[in-house]
Regions:
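S-adenosyl-L-methionine-dependent methyltransferase catalytic module, highlighting the catalytic core
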Residues: 77-85, 95-222, 226
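A short His-aromatic
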Residues: 71-75
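Conserved glycine-rich SAM-binding loop
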Residues: 4
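Conserved beta-strand/loop positions that form the S-adenosyl-L-methionine
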Residues: 1
């Protein structure tokens, strides 16, 4: 979900040719001319299909063994509806993996900005930087469309719907490791990555996240369809 141009699907298909892959992306905003590019990739490879639809409007009766999304959940307006719909798209025993920012930690990774009290106040303070970022990346409306629910609110939704779920807390170690190994990823995270490196060298990252239980900025949610 949120397959964009299909580049990741194309890469996965090259490594796992016997597995059937399918993408879902609404292309509603027109960001980066995704729809035109994805159609070109499909035509050249003819090995997977990208459905131009949101999850909420997806009409197929087909079910899947695995649904995954990376940095998509925070763009979904209605989290309970999204969780319910994706659960219904899973085969019995299927898995839905959601990787997204955890806004219980007051940091917004798309704009590399701290969150101050709430979304509106943050925008008032950082309006210039937010508008400049959207103009530079040609993603007008990105800030407005962000859903800043954190892990606590997501967990309440899951419990209210009596859904079988777990959080993979090891993602913290993998992301911290990636900051040290992936220069492009580190650069994209800006000042937050610098603080992470300093914290790691001073050994205070474990104090913050393990002992003091300060929320980690990212979360990996695993939902199982088990009846």
């Amino acid at each position: 979900i949120g397959s964009g141009t299909g580049l990741l699907l194309n890469e996965l298909k090259s490594h796992f040719p016997n597995i059937e892959f399918e993408g879902l992306d609404p292309n509603e905003s027109g960001f980066h001319n995704y729809k035109k590019i994805s159609k070109k990739i499909e035509a050249e490879n003819n090995s997977f299909h990208i459905n131009n639809s949101s999850v909420e409007n997806y009409k197929k009766e087909k079910k899947y063994d695995l649904i995954f999304s990376v940095n998509v959940f925070e763009h979904v307006k209605d989290h309970p509806k999204y969780i319910d719909k994706t659960l219904k798209l899973l085969n019995n025993g299927g898995t839905n993996i959601i990787i997204s920012p955890n806004y219980d930690f007051p940091y917004e990774p798309h704009f590399v900005l701290p969150l101050v009290i709430n979304k509106d106040i943050t925008y008032t303070i950082f309006k210039f930087f937010i508008n400049r970022h959207e103009a530079k990346t040609k993603e007008r409306g990105l800030w407005k469309d962000l859903n800043l629910n954190g892990k606590k609110k997501i967990e309440k939704i899951l419990k209210d719907q009596n859904i079988n779920y777990t959080f993979d807390y090891k993602i913290k170690d993998r992301i911290l490791e990636r900051i040290f190994k992936d220069k492009i990823f580190k650069k994209r995270q800006g000042f937050a990555a610098t603080l992470t490196v300093i914290g790691s060298y001073l050994k205070i990252d474990k104090l913050f996240f393990n002992f003091l239980k300060i929320p980690f900025p990212y979360m990996k949610l695993i939902i199982k369809n088990e009846k």
